[in-house]
């Protein structure tokens, strides 16, 4: 008798993706983040769906509808904070996932990598629009500042901004369309994630050594299903601790003040996961230059495969490249800190130096160090 799991058209796809998938025998915990991102996406879609049942995307009632969710809806507060902090967990997993890809040379799977970059942009867009919805002070002014950046585009900039706003300022039309996009994008992200996985399964997973592992594969289930379940439990534990003990730790207190176009907050800043990009944006005195640097700070990932000069794929056996990688991590943490600081001395110069170093490491130092390592090994 044939196994329905292996023959039925639907279960066959699931079987070949999550059960009988041949996986490298040596992939470490850094390979857990793909499944964790999937779990984060499911949590966000479910909590978001329940929030959307009670939320109203109208400037007059948006803020009070969020208050109503937290006060009057059964377990509304936990749904709201699971969604808000779930976004933070999502970005932690995203950054670690991208970092893993950089460290172990997973970007050599160019299709998978490029879909991943599109996914990163889509998640960032979704998070930005979601932050506008509670219609607090930081929601309103964050939306105003970030959408206004498009006015730096020559000739069409001003018209483009007014078209996105649906008027002459961030108002009811903007909030309504942001809610619509915020609702639809996670489903587009889900479809893109499926394509991401499709391309990955064309080549098979990379592994820490960067050496092809075709000669040594093990089935995904039970070895990596149990490993992913452990990762998922740790993720849910961290999220639960955050939600139940300090739900506002990563938020901005200004967002508990209803949006007021007549009163600008002293420090306009995005959520923590955008601070590194915000610091790069602010470090360039020219508006268009800042916007280009902001976009390129993420888009630079697309040219990483072209800058791979090493004869080895992974950094596992390349100590000089490892030092540079961790310098890059420290630099990104510095940028994150600077993004949350006011624009004054010494933060301005620190931000500018950190921004220069960020692009220097990725565009110049990494390729040069890789060539030096090749020569040291007489390759």
Swiss-Prot record:
Family annotation (CDD domains): cytochrome_b_C (cd00290), Cytochrome_b_N (cd00284)
Family statement drawn from the similarity comment of this UniProt entry: Belongs to the cytochrome b family.
Residues involved in heme b b562 binding: 83, 182
Sequence positions that bind heme b b566: 97, 196
SUPFAM superfamilies cross-referenced by the UniProt entry: a domain/subunit of cytochrome bc1 complex (Ubiquinol-cytochrome c reductase) (SSF81648), Transmembrane di-heme cytochromes (SSF81342)
Transmembrane segments: 33-53, 77-98, 113-133, 178-198, 226-246, 288-308, 320-340, 347-367
Protein name as annotated: Cytochrome b
Species for this entry: Mustela eversmannii (Steppe polecat)
One Gene Ontology biological process: mitochondrial electron transport, ubiquinol to cytochrome c
Other facts: Heme 1 (or BL or b562) is low-potential and absorbs at about 562 nm, and heme 2 (or BH or b566) is high-potential and absorbs at about 566 nm.
InterPro entries referenced in this protein's UniProt entry, alphabetically: Cyt_b/b6_C (IPR005798), Cyt_b/b6_C_sf (IPR036150), Cyt_b/b6_N (IPR005797), Cytb/b6-like_sf (IPR027387), Cytochrome_b (IPR030689), Cytochrome_b_C_euk/bac (IPR048260), Cytochrome_b_N_euk/bac (IPR048259), Di-haem_cyt_TM (IPR016174)
């Amino acid at each position: 008798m044939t196994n329905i799991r292996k023959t039925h058209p639907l279960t066959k796809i699931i079987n070949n993706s999550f059960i009988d998938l041949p996986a490298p025998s040596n992939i470490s915990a850094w390979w857990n983040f793909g499944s964790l991102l999937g779990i984060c996406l499911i949590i966000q879609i479910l909590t978001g769906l329940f929030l959307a049942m009670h939320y109203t995307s109208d400037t007059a009632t948006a803020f009070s509808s969020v208050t109503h969710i937290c006060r009057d809806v059964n377990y509304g507060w936990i749904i709201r904070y699971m969604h808000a902090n779930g976004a933070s967990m999502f970005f932690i997993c995203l950054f670690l996932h991208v970092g893993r890809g950089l460290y172990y040379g997973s970007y050599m799977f160019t299709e998978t990598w490029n879909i991943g970059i599109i996914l990163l942009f889509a998640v960032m867009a979704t998070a930005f629009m979601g932050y506008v919805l509670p219609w607090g002070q930081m929601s309103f002014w964050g939306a105003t500042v970030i959408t206004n950046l498009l006015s730096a585009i020559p000739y069409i900039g001003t018209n483009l901004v007014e078209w996105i706003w649906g008027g002459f300022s961030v108002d009811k039309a903007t909030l309504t369309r942001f809610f619509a996009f915020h609702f639809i994008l996670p489903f587009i992200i889900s479809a893109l994630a499926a394509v991401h996985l499709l391309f990955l399964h064309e080549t098979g997973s990379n592994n820490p050594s960067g050496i092809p592992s075709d000669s040594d594969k093990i089935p995904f289930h039970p070895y990596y299903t149990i490993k992913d379940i452990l990762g998922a439990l740790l993720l849910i534990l961290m999220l639960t601790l955050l939600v139940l003990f300090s739900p506002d730790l990563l938020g901005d207190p200004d967002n508990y003040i209803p949006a007021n176009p007549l009163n600008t907050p002293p420090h306009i800043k995005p959520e923590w996961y955008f601070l590194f990009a915000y610091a790069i944006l602010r470090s360039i005195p020219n508006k268009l230059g800042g916007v280009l640097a902001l976009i390129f700070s993420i888009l630079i990932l697309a040219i990483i495969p072209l800058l791979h000069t090493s004869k080895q794929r992974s950094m596992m056996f390349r100590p000089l490249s490892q030092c540079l990688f961790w310098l890059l991590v420290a630099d990104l943490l510095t940028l994150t800190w600077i993004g949350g600081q006011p624009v004054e001395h010494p933060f301005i110069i620190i931000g500018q130096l950190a921004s220069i170093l960020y692009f220097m490491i990725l565009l110049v130092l990494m390729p040069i160090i890789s060539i030096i390592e090749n020569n040291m090994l007489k390759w």
